[in-house]
Amino acid sequence: MSETLSRHRQLCDLLTEYGHQYYVLDNPTVPDAEYDRLMRELIAIESEHPELKTSASPSVRVGGQPLTAFRQVRHEIPMLSLDNVFSSEELQAFEQRMKDRLKREISFTFCCEPKLDGLAVSLLYVDGQLVQAATRGDGATGEEITENVRTIKAIPLSLRGSDWPARLEVRGEVFMPKAGFEAMNAKALAAGEKVFVNPRNAAAGSLRQLDSRITASRPLNFYAYGVGVGGDQLGDSHFGRLCQLKAWGLPMSPEVKLKEGAAGCQAFHDDILARRGELAYEIDGVVYKVDAIPLQEELGFVARAPRWATAHKFPAQEEMTLLENVEFQVGRTGAVTPVAKLKPVFVGGVTISNATLHNADEIERLGVMIGDTVIVRRAGDVIPQIVAVVEAQRPVDAREILFPTQCPVCGSALERLEGEVVTRCSGGLFCEAQRKEAIKHFAARRAMDVDGLGDKIVEQLVDKGLVKTPADLFSLNAIQLAGLERMGQKSALNLVAAIDAARSTTLPRFLFALGIREVGEATALNLANHFLTLDALRAASVEQLLEVADVGDIVAKHVYYFLRQPHNIEVLAAGIHWPAIEKKEASEQPFAGKTFVLTGTLNLLSRNDAKAALQALGAKVAGSVSAKTDVLVAGEAAGSKLAKAQELGITIWTEEQLQAALQS
């Protein structure tokens, strides 16, 4: 029992401290998943030993004490937390507990909502006017943030209509959309200021400003999710209440849906999880609430949460683990990237053992050392990265990360040009790592498209000394290729034929395949369409290169110096050729000067085909939405890009409208 008592005390202390850092200081030091694990362990101990549970236990509290810098506000109706489920089995058990509580067989209709990762707030309207806003605080007492909330454009200062209760308390989440968060951090980074780790911290930090002008400058948004005071004067459906709030001018998430039973909830969860990366805002799960208000009242509450609602958490996108070592990898352009070797940890649905540290500046910014406990984040398809260090757990034998001065692959000197954050190997194609990556890029589907020449084969070709430059690919024969691992005679003959077929290409593909720094597909296309021939491009001065659309000073210099090195285009001697490019008349390029962005799933055309078709008509196809975007093409499950385009008033096309425009 003494061991259990000791662990209970330790868990209470840890959760109290972590809760204070999360709710009060807006500076969480452990991932949500770690906090949830500790809380579940505490609840399990208290279930077996109820005598250990007191009114001061973290299991019956929500958040932490409010900051003394703000006036304290007592909530008339406590703002409780939610219990969690993490699997379909736990979801079914949640539904069964409610049936057992009601002592009858019943079919539940649930109001299902995304679980926004922001800051819960209470808004009090008196006679239709916003008179007070407060944070959740510890659930009983929050902090008054009225002046800051008044700066959030999504929150009405006066309710629309006239049929609202005389006193109405609206509850919801203040959050920062992904696009706004990224733009704000980019601006801060450019100014040498502190950046926020994630949108949740950014939203909370923005609301907790004593100067409301700072809050006003932040891209905050708000979605209502419930009613406190005054709710008894509204309808008997939770979803209906949200719709009523929307009619009065309070926004609700467009993803809110009514679903039947645990099976319907699970389907909602799976759908939102699949589209998580496309949503305009961060979420860490979904919330299920019994829709019928009379049933909510009958089910009641436990100490810290309602019995009629639960949060279904997604696989954690952030986890704690140990940084065991750092290796330095060399890329196609010589960029040296520090890669963290981690104690394997399950994050975002996969096991992670590596994470990028980006560059020397990022290592310095994080203050990370080998041996540290770190927080690693994996969101969607983004490469896992370390976002924070748990300095309190740093061991005495932690080691500084020393950036090498020589290439770890070829031994050439490393250099970092003034104004750049990237350190590069100066070895060029002498460096085996650069050689391999350059050849992989050259043969890629979007470049020379050598069918069957995968990464493993390229690595063998370089390791055996058969290929030193892309030009060497065209002198390979079937006998040489048949000597490679897992390469039979037939496969070797097929690969020789594929290499031979790749000699016929287009000038834009060839320019992209060369691997000139900063020259992507769009820039390669612009260069080809401007100069029409490789000879004209090679003869161009830096000033002439600057006349090409979207080519700035840095790109112009990269192109100029690259094409003046004979070995960079010796591949031409292998007989690579392309059809002549004809100067297009203005009538043939109706989208000239227009910038398009593609988002969501396209069904009529592949993304690459749509991009190529638009570029052929003179359009620029960008990867992100900005004020310079002319048209957004929105396919199925369009998310944050669509939301930003709507916010900026940009023209939005369906895929059918795009198809019609391409055929006209």
Curated annotation (Swiss-Prot):
Enzyme class per UniProt: ligase
Protein's UniProt keywords contain Lipoprotein: no
GO biological process: DNA repair; DNA replication
Keywords: DNA damage, DNA repair, DNA replication, Ligase, Magnesium, Manganese, Metal-binding, NAD, Zinc
Residues binding NAD(+), per UniProt: 32-36, 81-82, 113, 136, 173, 289, 313
Binding site for Zn(2+): 407, 410, 425, 431
EC nos: 6.5.1.2
Record bears the keyword Metal-binding: yes
UniProt superkingdom: Bacteria
Residues of the active site: 115
SS bond partners: none
Entry GO CC: cytosol
Reaction equation(s) it catalyzes: NAD(+) + (deoxyribonucleotide)n-3'-hydroxyl + 5'-phospho-(deoxyribonucleotide)m = (deoxyribonucleotide)n+m + AMP + beta-nicotinamide D-nucleotide
Stored Pfam families: BRCT (PF00533), DNA_ligase_aden (PF01653), DNA_ligase_OB (PF03120), DNA_ligase_ZBD (PF03119), HHH_2 (PF12826), HHH_5 (PF14520)
SUPFAM superfamilies assigned: BRCT domain (SSF52113), DNA ligase/mRNA capping enzyme, catalytic domain (SSF56091), Nucleic acid-binding proteins (SSF50249), RuvA domain 2-like (SSF47781)
Cofactor field: Mg(2+); Mn(2+)
Gene Ontology molecular function terms on file: DNA binding; DNA ligase (NAD+) activity; metal ion binding
Function noted in UniProt: DNA ligase that catalyzes the formation of phosphodiester linkages between 5'-phosphoryl and 3'-hydroxyl groups in double-stranded DNA using NAD as a coenzyme and as the energy source for the reaction. It is essential for DNA replication and repair of damaged DNA.
Family: Belongs to the NAD-dependent DNA ligase family. LigA subfamily.
Designated name of the protein: DNA ligase
Species, as recorded: Aeromonas salmonicida (strain A449)
